[in-house]
Each structure stands twice: as C-alpha cells, then as structure tokens.
Amino acid sequence: MKRILLLILVALISFSCKKKYQPRTIESIKITEFKMDSTSIRAIHAFNKNKLVFAGSKGAIGTTEDGGKSWNIKRLKHNDSIIPNFRSLAINENNGLFALSIGNPALLYNIGLNKEEIVYKEEHEKVFYDSMHFFDAEHGIAVGDPTDDCPSIILTSDEGKTWTKLPCNQLPKFEEGEAFFAASNTNIAIVNKTVWIASGGTKARILKSTDYGKSWEIYNTPIIQGDGPQGIYSIDFYDENNGIAIGGNYAKPNDNCANKAITKDGGKTWTLVAENQSPNYKSCVQYVPNTNGKEIFAVGKTGISFSNDGGNSWTEVSKDPYYTIQFVDQNTAWLSGHEKIGKLSLP
C-alpha cells in the first residue's frame, strides 16, 4: 500500500511540475518574399511548410510544392472573355480545390490537374462573394453580399459537386448597407460543425450556425460600424468558445478605436480589447497553433502585429503590408499581398 501511495504521490508531483506553455516575446520578424507579377492575392491555402495554393486577381491560380523555390501558375478565363477575380479559395479534406470569383457573374470553379469545372454560377447585378471554406470532406460554405434583404450563403454537402443557395426565410435579415468584406478569405471561421461569419458596413455582427450552415443565429458586436468600409474584416476561433474579431475602417487605416474584440462564449458576446492602442486597421487575424489561444498575428496594409496574451496587448513586428496570413505549425506561416507571397519562419 505504501508503495502504491508513493507512486501516486510521485505522479502527482511530476504532473504539477510539468512546464506550462510560456507565450513567446516577439519584437521583430523576417519574411521571405516571393514576387508574383500581375496579380493581387487575398486567398491562400497552406498545406505545410512546402506546399501552398493561392487564388488571385486576373484569374491567377498558383501552387508551390518546394517551399517557394518554384511556382506553377495558371490563369483562368471564362468563355474566352471573362477573367475571374478570385478572392475565395477552399480545399476539402479530399484535397478538392475550389476557387470563387467576385463580381457578376459569380463563378465557382473545381480545379483539377488537367481541367477546370464550373460547379456554381450566379448572375445578379448585386452578386459579390467574399469568402469560402470547407468543414470537412463533404460540407462547405461560401458567403457573399446581399442580393435581397439577407446575406448570400451557398452550401454543399457532396464534396463540392453541387452548391445550393439558402433562401432568405432561412437566414437572418441584414440591415441596409450591411455586407461582408472580401479582404482575406477570413471573415469565416470554422470549428467542427460550427461556423461563424463576420459582417461590416452599417452593422458589424456575427452570424453563427452549429449545423453546417443549415440554421442561423446573429449577434451584435461593439466593433466600429456605420457608413463606409468599417466593421469586422476577419475572425478566428481557437476553439468553440474563444475567438477574436478584427477590422476597423479601411478608409481610415490608422484609427485604432473599436476595431478588435474577443469572445469567450462562442460569439454571443464580445468585449473590446486594446482600445485606442495598436493594432490599427487589419484585414486578417489568426491564432498561432498550439499556443493555448495566447499567440495571435494580425496583418493588413498597415503592417503586422503580434499578441502573446490573447489579444489584450499587441506589438508591431513588421511594417510590411500583407492581406492575409495562415499558419501551418507553431513556427511557420504563409502570407499573401499585392503581387507577392511571403513565408514567415519564427525562431
């Protein structure tokens, strides 16, 4: 009995003495930059340190499989006349590649090695799709600005073979002037079957579904809202409860008032953080993997900022302008911007 008690005591002491994760202090970073001529890139999918896919303007779809040493870039054209401007890109768990264009007509491509197939097309004077993601191998979602009095949301449940637009009677109503921002393909966040979408304009709100996008709730936020290009540009969730939203006013990028907030209850309520402090306007925010929700990067045309306390305080680590960032592990991330891709390697 004494031996058993001793073993239990040793195990408890060992467990309690395990080193807790200590967030890093990062004051500057180095990014390896790859020039991409004649395309502005707001949508990327990073597989690992070596493999990345991007979708950009002027129909550009690009890939690297050797960490950026070489690139394969193709440019798509519809009916030999329409050049799609891509701002949405998604990969399902079976590695199906999908790219969605903004503007009229909206063109959603399934892109293979030797062919490109349009699996969804929508024509409307107001059509404008902003971002797209997959939950898993079968279920996917894309969101766009209202063509009626509700957001445009299309869903797939067959690996992207077919897409269906939800009717307005199944969606929350939008205020006049409320829409989404196609800035970084990150105004959607997904954890398991739950999806959150962030809006801006006259209202800055969070839409939430816990059933692959079939039914919806909507919540208010204290993020700046009103006239013009202000609101939430990007969201990310570390788990089903803890998330962060960031944005601001694109027309006043140096303002840092009411442009970042966190939630601890799955998006129902939001609290402003770092009020009247950096960072200012940002188009993308992402948690660093395996850092217990403490380390966060935010990027935009105003530079790159880092937080090691869950978003409460920030440090500007670079003035380089980028639209979006995506981590593949605790130390490696890919970024994209105007005519460039970046690769960040942390120590």
Locations of regions flagged by a protein language model:
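Blade-level signature of beta-propeller repeat domains, shared across WD40, Kelch, NHL, RCC1
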Residues: 327-347
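Beta-strand-rich domains and repeat architectures in extracellular enzymes and scaffolds
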Residues: 33-59
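Asp-box/BNR beta-propeller loop motif
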Residues: 22-36, 59-79, 105-124, 153-172, ...
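Short, solvent-exposed loop/turn segments at conserved positions within beta-propeller repeat blades
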Residues: 103-104, 146-150, 200-202, 252-256
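Entry beta-strands of beta-propeller and related beta-repeat scaffolds
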Residues: 51-53, 95-98, 138-142, 194-196, ...
